[in-house]
From Swiss-Prot:
SUPFAM superfamilies: Zn-binding ribosomal proteins (SSF57829)
Protein name listed in UniProt: Large ribosomal subunit protein bL33
BP-aspect Gene Ontology terms: translation
Gene Ontology CC entries for this record: cytosolic large ribosomal subunit
GO function terms (MF aspect): structural constituent of ribosome
Annotated source species: Beijerinckia indica subsp. indica (strain ATCC 9039 / DSM 1715 / NCIMB 8712)
Keywords on record: Ribonucleoprotein, Ribosomal protein
Family: Belongs to the bacterial ribosomal protein bL33 family.
Length: 55
């Protein structure tokens, strides 16, 4: 069987609230770490979310 291209990642809030999103990325084409500005409902603002491993 072939190795799956899509892997699950966790996008963790940089506001240190502990809030996170879970998404998928193609590990073969996107080798760099992802970073998005998304909504954090704990601080009720848009903040940067950075990629971390799912434990």
């Amino acid at each position: 069987m072939a190795k799956a291209a899509m892997i699950k990642i966790k996008l963790l809030s940089t506001a240190d609230t502990g809030y996170f999103y879970v998404t998928k990325k193609n590990a073969r084409t996107k080798t760099e770490k992802l970073s998005f500005k998304k909504y954090d409902p704990v601080v009720r603002k848009h903040v940067e979310f950075k990629e971390t491993k799912i434990k």
